[in-house]
Amino acid sequence: MRISQARRTLVLALSAALLTAGAAQAQDKNSIKVGVSVGNGEQIFEVVKKVAARDGLNVQVIVFNDYQLPNAALASGDLDANAFQHQPFLDNQIKARGFDLVPVALTITAPLGFYSHKIKDISALPDGASVGIQNDPSNGNRALLLLQSAGLITLKPEAVKNNTATPLDVVTNPKKLKLVPLDAAQLPRSLDDLAIAAINNDYAEKAGLSFTKDAILKEAPKGPYANLIAVRRADKDKPWVQRLVKAYHSPEVKTFIETKFNGSLIPAF
């Protein structure tokens, strides 16, 4: 009886251990889908993918041309993570659309630039010029702050403080510039119709524009706009998230960013 009872206890203990191990394994994944933006983000994640594979994590890279789509895809479960946005953009999306998403790691800083097909120096910007800026709140605010830093406009102090500037917050505009909000992806294609346009680095890269060589007005490289990896809140502590972050923060990925982009993208880790 005692031997039988001991065996029964051992079997139950082993079963419990196997169930616990199985549950932990079920929480982890060996294959994930990550949404990135076309261009720079796509190139970086090809390296991340190789590093992650050595750790047994298969990363499927899903490329997006529209900033409005990756968070919706993540929230709906079509993606496991995304890596394309900075914190102000994520905050705005959460507020506007109710996504339950959280950042888990920083990736790169991508300074914003203004580009032109018509002038070579920002000092040559004519009166009444059409100026393209992004129509999403966070990047539009960013473009307006850059115009203010060049003395081209001034903004309401409260809007600057809260990072909520829109064209309606312009207080002075001595050159009578015409601010033209457009979708971020459309701005490179609109350069022939605009005097200058604010273009995010991933779209600039795709259009054959170099931040270091072609931008005529440049955002400081260090600022609050470091990009990040986001996941659903329910997933933030899962082992595969740590493995993904470890792969992105590897020396191999850092070296690739520094050598490939020559200052137009800067590792934020």
Model regions: which residues?
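Alpha-to-beta junction loops
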Residues: 75-85, 129, 152, 175-177, ...
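Pocket-flanking alpha-helical
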Residues: 67-98, 113-115, 120, 204-208
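Immediate post-signal peptide segment of exported/extracytoplasmic ligand-binding proteins
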Residues: 23-33, 52-53, 122-128
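Ligand-binding "clamshell"
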Residues: 92-104, 117-119, 193, 198, ...
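Periplasmic-binding protein-like
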Residues: 106-116, 205-249, 265-269
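A conserved helix-loop-strand patch within extracytoplasmic ligand-binding domains
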Residues: 104-154, 254
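Short helix-initiation/N-cap motifs at beta->coil->alpha
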Residues: 62-72, 159-189
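Short, well-ordered beta-strand elements
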Residues: 28-39, 59-63, 130-131
